[in-house]
Amino acid sequence: MGSSFYRSFEERHRGSVEEIKRRLSFYLPFLAGLKDIYPDGVIADIGCGRGEWLEILNENGIVNIGVDLDDGMLARAREAGLNVQKMDCLQFLQSQADQSLIALTGFHIAEHLPFEVLQQLVMHTLRVLKPGGLLILETPNPENVSVGTCSFYMDPTHNHPLPPPLLEFLPIHYGFNRAIT
């Protein structure tokens, strides 16, 4: 897929940068305690796209890094002055030291990955998180009839829907203490 296609697609069908930032702000309260415990802790955002979440983290004084493979998305993130790298999510995680991150986030990336890659992502995330660290994955909810029958398939890069019970089971199976969907 050309580097300009997916960026144009996202801008037309996902929402403006401002709208996405408004939606993602929901997750900030989950990080408050971690920021207090680890004031210099780093959050990595895989599949960072245009960097909306990274902007929110910057605005809240949270050290971060974004990782993506799409040149068009990375170009926008770099234009915004964000700290991003072009790298596969597993390569990134494998390059991180044990207990080096306070959180790993991935908004609308899980549904793009083969399930085996998602399993490895969860396993590696547990290794790189500091005690009490968080894994936050947001994905379209196929239990919503409109999402499960139509809008999920609008994105040609989606592999398969991930039902909430499956997404909740995955981190528990690989050693996380709890999971919430």
Mark where each language-model region is:
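Conserved N-terminal segment of class I S-adenosyl-L-methionine
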Residues: 1-99, 103, 107, 117-122
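A short His-aromatic
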Residues: 111-113
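Short, glycine-/aromatic-enriched active-site segment of Class I SAM-dependent methyltransferases
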Residues: 137-158
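Short alpha-helix
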Residues: 159-175
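Conserved catalytic-core motifs of eukaryotic protein kinase domains, centered on the activation segment
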Residues: 116-117, 148
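Conserved S-adenosyl-L-methionine
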Residues: 176-181
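Hydrophobic/aromatic residues located in beta-strands of well-ordered beta-sheets
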Residues: 64, 135-137
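A short glycine-rich, Lys/Arg-flanked "PGG" loop and its adjoining helix->strand segment in the class I
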Residues: 119-134
